């Protein structure tokens, strides 16, 4: 007690705990941070299982910041999906530039597996169904785009071998679908190594094509 006034050193302003300061970022840096956090959460929990609150908390910001950059969870998800689709499409189509058809098949199969290995979260997002994906693009639509390019390659090969080039779209869908489904399986098992998986895919696809019958028939009798 001093001069009738109680002195409490514990209430000194210098002793009060300080709150952690929010890291200052530019608009572009904050947007990228939110995209990275959203990408991770969408891969782990899916679109429905992820909330704006959780995204904001992970970023250390308030919910309005997420809305300011993307308009909401749907907008953020759409941007994430679009970026992953571009990444995968660029990788696979870049492998279909030039070379012998077998080499092109090898390169395309390896490119898909390489994407899965390098961008696992992105691939999980692409293959997971979401209502939002219906308007932003789906894995099925991406595979269809790739099949269209494979169709052109097969069309030339069919002409050279005397097969009907009108059937190229059917075979293109079958080939790309085979590689895509195998990729989804390999996403979880990761065995054998991607080079070996690609080799086996090409082995089945190429030797199957190499031994094609010009007019295949079903062994059993079918009316339709």
Regions found by a protein language model. Name each.
Residues 33, 37, 41-75, 79:
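Helix-turn-helix
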Residues 44-48, 119, 161:
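Short coil/turn segments at alpha/beta junctions that flank glycine-rich nucleotide-binding fingerprints
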Residues 2-10, 164-185, 196-208:
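Hydrophobic alpha-helical segments that form the core
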Residues 86-89, 135-159, 169-174, 196-199, ...:
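Amphipathic alpha-helical packing segments from all-alpha helical-bundle domains
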């Amino acid at each position: 007690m001093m001069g009738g006034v109680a002195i409490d050193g514990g209430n000194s302003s210098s002793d009060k705990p300080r709150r952690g300061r929010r890291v200052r970022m530019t608009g572009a840096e904050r947007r990228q941070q939110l995209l990275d956090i959203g990408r991770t959460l969408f891969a782990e929990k899916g679109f429905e299982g992820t909330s704006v609150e959780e995204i904001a908390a992970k970023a250390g910001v308030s919910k309005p910041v997420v809305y300011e950059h993307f308009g909401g969870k749907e907008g953020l998800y759409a941007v994430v999906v679009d970026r992953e689709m571009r990444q995968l499409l660029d990788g696979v189509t870049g492998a279909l530039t030039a070379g012998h058809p077998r080499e092109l098949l090898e390169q395309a199969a390896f490119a898909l597996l390489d994407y899965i290995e390098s961008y696992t979260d992105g691939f999980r997002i692409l293959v997971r169904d979401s209502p939002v994906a219906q308007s932003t693009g789906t894995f099925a639509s991406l595979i269809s785009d790739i099949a269209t390019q494979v169709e052109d390659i097969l069309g030339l090969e069919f002409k050279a071998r005397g097969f009907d080039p009108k059937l190229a779209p059917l075979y293109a869908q079958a080939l790309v679908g085979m590689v895509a489904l195998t990729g989804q399986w390999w996403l979880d098992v990761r065995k054998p190594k991607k080079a070996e998986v690609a080799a086996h895919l090409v082995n089945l696809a190429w030797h199957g094509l190499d031994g094609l019958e010009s007019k295949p028939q079903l062994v059993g009798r079918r009316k339709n």
